[in-house]
């Protein structure tokens, strides 16, 4: 099995093949980002705050509407809080004003209180530019793999090792 590594040309071809797979995945992600006008067009629900609408591990597909279009009450959006890395999936429950200057208040369907405590210090409401995108579709539980990989880092190492071995040992 490892005899294929003795030929440097074949080993280089395998390495290039692996790089091609990674770069293709990256280009597909960036292309999807451009099409959806969202820096993160696919997100995973990380908590139970949106139950029963979305469960932990659901994979959400986002579409970021044009900033000039209205964002409506009842719409499920994903937003980033300043200085925090994890996007939040919650529903818009109140809207003050109209257009790009509208102020938005969000809340998780399974939460008792609104999100004002989650917003950045001194921020009482979200603005349209805080929204990463609106949820347009989802696939139940597919994103649970991501949750497992973040909760158990050793799984990530095992998966990467297996993928690397498959690429190296594959014969063409």
Curated annotation (Swiss-Prot):
Annotated stretches, region: C-terminal short (CTS) helix: 158-169
Principal location class: endoplasmic reticulum
Transmembrane segments: 15-35
Catalytic residue list: 49 (charge relay system), 90 (charge relay system), 115 (charge relay system)
Disulfide bonds: none
Topological relation to the membrane, as annotated: Single-pass type II membrane protein
Catalysed conversion reaction: Cleavage of hydrophobic, N-terminal signal or leader sequences from secreted and periplasmic proteins
Ranges in the topological domain labelled Cytoplasmic: 1-14
Source domain of life: Eukaryota
Segments on the Lumenal face: 36-172
Compartments where located: Endoplasmic reticulum membrane
GO cellular component: a single term: signal peptidase complex
EC number, as in UniProt: 3.4.21.89
InterPro entries for the chain: LexA/Signal_pep-like_sf, Pept_S26A_signal_pept_1_Ser-AS, Peptidase_S26, Peptidase_S26B
Broad class of enzyme this protein falls into: hydrolase
GO MF: serine-type endopeptidase activity
Listed GO biological process terms: signal peptide processing
Domains: entry comment: The C-terminal short (CTS) helix is essential for catalytic activity. It may be accommodated as a transmembrane helix in the thinned membrane environment of the complex, similarly to the signal peptide in the complex substrates.
NCBIfam families named in the record: sigpep_I_arch
Family as reported in the entry's similarity comment: Belongs to the peptidase S26B family.
UniProt xrefs under PANTHER family: SIGNAL PEPTIDASE COMPLEX CATALYTIC SUBUNIT SEC11
Function, in words: Catalytic component of the signal peptidase complex (SPC) which catalyzes the cleavage of N-terminal signal sequences from nascent proteins as they are translocated into the lumen of the endoplasmic reticulum. Specifically cleaves N-terminal signal peptides that contain a hydrophobic alpha-helix (h-region) shorter than 18-20 amino acids.
Quaternary structure note: Component of the signal peptidase complex (SPC) composed of a catalytic subunit SEC11 and three accessory subunits SPC1, SPC2 and SPC3. The complex induces a local thinning of the ER membrane which is used to measure the length of the signal peptide (SP) h-region of protein substrates. This ensures the selectivity of the complex towards h-regions shorter than 18-20 amino acids. SPC associates with the translocon complex.
Protein name: Signal peptidase complex catalytic subunit SEC11
Species this chain originates from: Verticillium alfalfae (strain VaMs.102 / ATCC MYA-4576 / FGSC 10136)
Taxonomic lineage: Eukaryota, Fungi, Dikarya, Ascomycota, Pezizomycotina
């Amino acid at each position: 099995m490892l005899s294929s590594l003795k030929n440097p040309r074949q080993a280089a071809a395998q390495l290039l093949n692996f790089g091609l797979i990674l770069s293709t995945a990256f280009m597909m992600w960036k292309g999807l980002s451009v099409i959806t006008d969202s820096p993160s067009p696919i997100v995973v629900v990380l908590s139970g705050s949106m139950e029963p609408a979305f469960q932990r591990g659901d994979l959400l597909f986002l579409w970021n509407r044009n900033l000039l279009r209205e964002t409506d009450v009842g719409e499920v959006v994903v937003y980033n809080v300043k200085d925090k890395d994890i996007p939040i999936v919650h529903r818009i429950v109140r809207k003050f004003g109209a257009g790009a200057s509208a102020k938005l208040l969000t809340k998780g369907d399974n939460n008792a209180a609104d999100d004002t405590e989650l917003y950045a210090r001194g921020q009482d409401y979200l603005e349209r530019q805080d929204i990463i995108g609106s949820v347009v579709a989802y696939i139940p539980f597919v994103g649970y793999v991501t949750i497992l990989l973040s909760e158990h880092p050793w799984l990530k190492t095992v998966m990467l090792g297996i993928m690397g071995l498959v690429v190296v040992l594959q014969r063409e």
